[in-house]
Curated annotation (Swiss-Prot):
A single cellular component GO annotation: cytosol
Binding positions for N(6)-(1,2-dicarboxyethyl)-AMP per the UniProt entry: 9-10, 75-77, 101-102, 223, 274, 279-281, 318-322
Origin: domain of life: Archaea
InterPro entries found in the cross-reference section: AdenyloSucc_lyase_C (IPR019468), Fumarase/histidase_N (IPR024083), Fumarate_lyase_CS (IPR020557), Fumarate_lyase_fam (IPR000362), Fumarate_lyase_N (IPR022761), L-Aspartase-like (IPR008948), Pur_lyase (IPR004769)
Gene behind this protein: purB
Name of the protein: Adenylosuccinate lyase
Pathway: Purine metabolism; AMP biosynthesis via de novo pathway; AMP from IMP: step 2/2; Purine metabolism; IMP biosynthesis via de novo pathway; 5-amino-1-(5-phospho-D-ribosyl)imidazole-4-carboxamide from 5-amino-1-(5-phospho-D-ribosyl)imidazole-4-carboxylate: step 2/2
Length: 450
């Protein structure tokens, strides 16, 4: 029976399978098998025992149902795994879990799950980067109105919008590589982190286990890998979500009926409303923005998991069972949705131009002021002169430049040709160069494998 929407509505099957309870069990078994092999290599247990444990440390031998049956009796999840594995290993079962504490297995298995999940996140981020780069290149010269405080400001370009998001996605990719160094760690240090239970060969055993599993050993732990590591991971996932939220919010606003410069794709048979047949709602970007709120909220319990009693208590455990799979699956849904939205993004050039001229050149107040300053009027005086003209044009619903032509204060410094050259399309500064620089940087990072 599916209860949580991540079971049936959100996320790809690929990501959900990683956090499926059967795969989680397999990762725990993988760690137990690696531990047995390490013990055999240092001479602590027979090689034959390590071989049998390794062969049977999988869900074909160790059934999830049996693990649950044992746990229901003993009320300890990892000991249930140990008992179930030991049962199928016969006489060799006595070597299962030798020297380990539960979180040697749990934290190391978690690192394996996180590693698989981050591989999907990285792939999606790089695909999203490619889409944004193409959009930035294609729309490098698509001039539109820039808005600050929800009001028309001065012109910008769609190339700038996409390059801004592109640069942010690139930063996330770079953060991800740095993050993996700190997050993809495991431990074989025993009950309080001293490794006393592993004897003189403790460091060698831990090294062998981590090399076997493709992880690094944490430098120091108590009973657990410290949860600042998980908090950083959850913050990273939320930070990526915030970028997708930002993108979704902008697209939703630009899709408003009265703006309608762009629109997320809308299928031929898609229904927008159960009662309003005409509706073309931005449901994909709304979903992205909504799911982001869940990822933001999961950062708080991740932070609260860091301070625990002494060498460790159990209050982090139940929380992590929820926030780790939930955050990864929901971010997976968000990334894949945003890729679809951007790939099918629809543009309305006539509305982009209409909005650019909607204020009847009030948006040219800044370049008009700067032109006056360039011609000799003091900057502060020019600001006040243009401000008064802009207010007059607004009150009278007239074109600012037409009002300016009637002003002696303006014509004293500027010719009619000077005023005619003040067009929104001409006032985008270094937008093209900025976009090109971002693209060049991203391409350089791609060549470096980042």
């Amino acid at each position: 029976m599916a209860v949580h929407p991540i079971d049936y509505r959100y996320g790809s099957e690929e990501m959900r399978k990683i956090w499926d309870e059967k795969n989680k069990l397999q990762k725990l078994l993988d760690v137990e098998a690696a531990l047995a092999r390490a013990h055999a290599k240092v001479g602590n247990i027979p090689e034959e025992s390590a071989k049998v444990i390794s062969e049977r440390a999988n869900t074909k031998w160790v059934k999830l149902e049996r693990v649950k049956e044992i746990e229901a009796e003993i009320h300890h999840d990892i000991m249930a795994v140990v008992k179930a594995l030991s049962e199928v290993c016969g006489e060799h079962g006595k070597y299962v879990h030798l020297g380990a504490t539960s979180n040697d297995i749990i934290d190391t298995a978690n690192a394996l799950l996180i590693k698989e999940s981050l591989e999907i996140v990285e792939r999606d981020l790089k695909e999203l980067r490619s889409i944004l780069k193409q959009l930035a290149e294609k729309h490098i010269g698509t001039v539109c109105i820039g808005r600050t405080h929800g009001q028309h400001a001065v012109p910008t370009t769609y190339g700038m919008k996409f390059a801004l998001w592109l640069d942010e996605i690139q930063r996330h990719i770079e953060r991800l590589y740095q993050l993996k160094e700190r997050v993809l760690v495991g431990k074989m240090r025993g009950a309080v982190g001293t490794a006393a239970s592993f004897g003189e060969k403790a460091f060698e055993i831990e090294r062998l286990v981590m090399e076997d599993l493709g992880l690094k050993p944490a430098r120091i732990t108590n009973q657990i890998v410290q949860r600042d590591v998980y908090a950083e991971l959850l913050f990273f996932l939320a930070l990526v979500a915030s970028t997708l939220d930002k993108m979704g919010l902008e697209i939703r606003n630009l899709q408003r009926t009265e703006i309608l410069e762009v629109s997320e794709p809308f299928g031929e048979k898609q229904v927008g409303s159960s009662t309003m047949p005409h509706k073309r709602n931005p449901i994909r970007t709304e979903k992205v923005c909504g799911l982001a709120r869940v990822l933001y909220s999961n950062v708080i319990p991740a932070l609260l998991n860091n301070p625990l009693w002494h060498e460790r208590d159990l209050t982090n455990s139940s929380v992590e069972r929820v926030i780790l799979p939930e955050s990864f699956v929901l971010l997976d849904e968000m990334l894949k949705t945003m890729k679809k939205v951007l790939t099918g993004l629809e543009f309305f050039p006539e509305n982009i131009r209409r909005n650019l001229y909607l204020t009847k050149n009030l948006i040219m107040a800044e370049p008009l002021m700067l032109k006056l300053a360039e011609k000799g009027m003091g900057r502060q005086e020019a600001h006040e002169v243009v401000r008064q003209l802009a207010m007059k044009a607004f009150r009278e619903n007239r074109d600012l430049l037409e009002v300016a032509k009637e002003s002696r204060e303006i014509t004293k410094y500027l010719t009619e040709r000077d005023l005619e050259e003040l067009k929104p399309e001409n006032y985008i500064g270094k937008a093209r160069e900025i976009v090109k620089k971002v693209i060049e940087y991203v391409e350089e990072m791609e060549r470096r494998g980042l």
